[in-house]
Design a protein with these regions (language model features):
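Intracellular juxtamembrane helix-capping segments at the cytosolic ends
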Residues: 115-130, 332-345
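A late C-terminal transmembrane helix in Major Facilitator Superfamily
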Residues: 347-378
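Helix-loop boundary and gating motifs at the non-cytosolic
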Residues: 2-56, 231, 240-257
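Hydrophobic core of transmembrane alpha-helices in multi-pass small-molecule transporters
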Residues: 20, 101-118, 237, 318-332
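Helix-to-loop junctions at the C-terminal end of transmembrane segments
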Residues: 61-75, 162, 279-291, 375-376
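Juxtamembrane intracellular "pre-TM" segments in multi-pass secondary transporters
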Residues: 1-12, 190-233, 415-424
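C-terminal transmembrane helical hairpin of 12-TM major facilitator-type secondary transporters
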Residues: 279, 293-337
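Structural signature of the two symmetry-related core transmembrane helices
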Residues: 78-92, 175, 294-309, 388
Length: 424
């Protein structure tokens, strides 16, 4: 199936809707939770920080467990439905509970387990791409652009709903979106591996059920995670940690050191998110041609240059002019590594996607801690130098990926290195 004919596939259209709904759920909940805790249960800044830190740690563990278990299930849609409904339950909890510890428990149990939906969507996307005969980086980038669009419109809608009505209305809408996503997963998405009519069999398909090696499951979730995968994960954590530091630090830097309006930070983040949408698709389209490792190295160069320039930029036009560099590296970091991880763990898309999702959350957790430490001692502007250091180190790790031992590639007619791609 050609790339752009994908949109005529009913299963792909439903997957786009699911990705958009899940993206909006995250865009409604994540940016508003700190304000919700402060206004409804009078949480202190320390309590808010502990709330996010505890949830992040819990999500890392639940992502890995759900990912390993999902690879042994015959139908991944079961996990998608369950996690979407858990997100709905968490949103309902936010509408009725007004005790800090009850909200914390709800967040850990419902949103902690429900957050695994993010990684499972990656895994399902990979399986559907293989079944449709479409290159996975392009397909993944296409769907990630839908999530980015949700994050462009979601936060403004969320804060508008709070201003016009209340937190209750916002979280009821969040619960409804989660239920819609669950219904689409159950009755709109085909079983993973089902081929569209007229689609030739994928070259990686096995000849029979007995030819496919059974995934190791929960007790063996780290089986096959060798040096190559660990270096790749380290690079991802550093990149996403730098991104978290930037997003946390930017509003404080803009208002405290540049003395601009707080809306300026929202404008910068919004412009970058809009630019990311086409770049996500382009990164996916070019990943196999250029090579995933090369794209990651280019991304780290763009990121290091961007963060290295920020301390010297003092005007809004120049800040806006720098956003294409930011969007370019983020588009690669949010798309290519998850496909590379799936390539490094063939037959285990759930575990590989959970590793990426966990690395994403570990990067956010570590980035939040680093911002507080660096800003306290040196100021907000110096945080960007720390970001540049992290992305430069991520680039060095990406350089080592070629020489690191890696697992055998997936059985196919293409014998290129999973991170190198085809020769141009």
């Amino acid at each position: 199936m050609s790339r752009w004919r994908l949109v005529t596939d009913p299963a792909v259209r439903d997957l786009i809707a699911v990705s958009g709904a899940i993206g909006l759920v995250g865009a409604f909940v994540v940016p508003t939770t700190s304000l919700f805790l402060t206004e409804t249960v009078a949480a202190t800044p320390l309590m808010v920080g502990l709330f996010f830190a505890t949830r992040s740690i819990a999500e890392i563990g639940t992502d890995m467990v759900v990912g390993a278990v999902s690879d042994r299930l015959r139908d991944r849609r079961t996990i998608l439905v369950a996690t979407a409904l858990l997100n709905a339950a968490g949103a309902v909890g936010y509408t009725v509970l007004r005790d800090y510890y009850a909200l914390l428990l709800t967040s850990i149990v419902c949103f902690g387990l429900g957050g695994a939906c993010f990684g499972q969507l990656f895994a399902y996307t990979r399986e559907l791409a293989d079944a449709r005969g479409v290159d996975a980086p392009f397909f993944n980038g296409f769907l990630r652009s839908v999530t980015s669009l949700a994050w462009v419109v979601g936060p403004p809608l969320a804060f508008w709903a709070i201003a016009q009505w209340s937190f209750t209305v916002l979280y009821v809408a969040t619960a409804a979106l989660s239920v819609v996503a669950a219904l689409l997963c159950r009755w709109g998405l085909p079983p993973p591996g089902t081929q569209a009519a007229g689609t030739p069999p994928a070259t990686a398909a096995s000849d029979g059920p007995g030819d496919e090696e059974q995934p190791p499951g929960l007790l063996g979730m780290f089986a096959g995670v060798g040096l190559h995968t660990m270096i790749l994960l380290g690079s991802v954590v550093l990149l996403l940690g730098a991104n978290a530091m930037y997003q946390i630090n930017l509003p404080l830097y803009v208002t405290d050191e540049l003395h601009m309006n707080a809306r300026t930070a929202g404008l910068l983040l919004g412009v970058s998110a809009v630019l990311e949408i086409p770049l996500l698709v382009l990164a996916g389209a070019w990943a196999d041609r250029i090579g995933k490792r090369r794209l990651m190295i280019v991304a780290t160069v763009c990121a290091t240059l961007f963060f290295g320039l920020l301390p010297f930029i003092r005007s809004l036009p120049l800040l806006l002019a720098a956003q294409p560099l930011n969007a370019a590296w983020v588009a690669v970091a949010f798309n290519v590594p998850v496909v590379a991880l799936q390539d490094s763990l063939p037959g285990r898309p759930g575990t590989a996607s959970a590793l990426y999702s966990s690395a994403f959350k570990a990067g956010m957790f570590l980035g939040g801690l680093a911002v507080g430490t660096v800003a306290t001692w040196t100021g907000y502007g110096q945080v960007f130098w720390a970001c540049a250091g992290l992305t430069a180190l991520a680039g060095l790790l990406a350089l080592f990926l070629r020489s690191a031992p890696h697992p055998p590639p997936r059985p196919s007619t293409d014998h290129t290195h999973p991170l190198e791609g085809r020769a141009a």
